[in-house]
């Protein structure tokens, strides 16, 4: 079996990379793809949680593997070292691929190219390396991406139904990336946020939506800005409790996120009685 190692991060959903993988799958009778997504920290926020950074890379892996399966491709994937050179060399040592595809932004935007990643990988591995340049600013993505920020209301029926309608109305495939901010810096906060996230994803995927997610910074604004730094999205949905009970609304979260992005920002109100129950929480 021929194995092709694919290394990409923010350009992972680019049509050129997808087209190249598709052509390889058609040209080679018995081929599999191994995806490596190096971790990438956002610049916003005073504290960046390592687990959240890793989760964001895992989202890319999960969604890419789902897309590959839809294309009929045999693929597996992993989150890699933050250094793309080390991430690639680790995968080469473990998997012993036959060739490598590396996807980057154009030279003027790519930190990987400024560090001569393509040449270094070729020289160190001795393997064929194909470089795919994806200019997302010009080309866009072949699917829509909705960022969803929610905490206590994350499993609310109003929110799930609104997202289901969005997917049904869009002519393109639509991906949903959920971010559930931690409640605080306590030891139980990550567990509680992961439980909320799991319940939300179970409902979204049960409704037939292509969704993945991560926990985020305790400050919902920082969680949103970090996600906007990590992912290219065309819309943001923020779900809160009703006005008088929402700390997020009292802090003007909707307006602040609107100022931080050119993407459309939509607010979905969910009453606590309709939301996920059983996990202690501050008002979202």
Where do the model's predicted regions map?
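Small/aliphatic-rich secondary-structure junction motif
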Residues: 1-48, 131-134, 142-191, 267-270
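Short helix-loop-beta junction
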Residues: 63-73, 169, 199-209
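Glycine-rich, Arg-bearing micro-motifs that act as flexible, cationic patches
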Residues: 104-119, 240-255
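Short, flexible loop segments at boundaries between secondary-structure elements
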Residues: 126-140, 262-280
């Amino acid at each position: 079996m021929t194995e092709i190692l694919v290394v990409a991060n923010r350009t992972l959903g680019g049509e050129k990379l997808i087209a190249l993988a598709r052509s390889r799958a058609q040209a080679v009778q018995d081929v599999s793809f191994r995806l490596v997504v190096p971790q990438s920290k956002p610049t916003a926020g005073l504290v960046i949680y390592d687990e959240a950074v890793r989760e964001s890379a895992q989202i890319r892996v999960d969604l890419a593997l789902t897309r590959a399966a839809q294309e009929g491709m045999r693929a597996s994937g992993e989150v890699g070292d933050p250094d793309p050179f080390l991430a690639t060399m680790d995968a080469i040592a473990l998997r012993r691929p036959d060739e490598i595809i590396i996807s980057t932004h154009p030279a003027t935007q790519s930190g990987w190219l400024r560090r001569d990643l393509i040449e270094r990988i070729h020289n160190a591995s001795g393997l064929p390396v194909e470089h795919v340049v994806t200019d997302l600013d010009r080309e866009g993505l072949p699917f829509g991406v909705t960022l969803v920020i929610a905490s206590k209301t994350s499993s609310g029926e109003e929110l799930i139904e609104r997202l289901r309608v969005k997917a049904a109305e869009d002519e393109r495939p639509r991906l949903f990336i959920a971010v559930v901010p931690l409640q605080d810096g306590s030891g139980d906060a990550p567990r509680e946020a992961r439980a909320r996230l799991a319940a939300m994803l179970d409902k979204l995927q049960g409704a037939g939506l292509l969704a993945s997610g991560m926990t985020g910074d305790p400050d919902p604004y920082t969680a949103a800005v970090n996600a906007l730094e990590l992912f290219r999205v065309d819309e943001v949905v923020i779900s809160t409790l009703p006005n008088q009970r929402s700390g997020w609304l009292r802090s003007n979260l909707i307006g602040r996120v609107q100022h931080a992005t050119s993407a459309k920002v939509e607010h979905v109100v969910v009453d606590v009685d309709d939301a996920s129950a059983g996990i202690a929480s501050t008002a979202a």
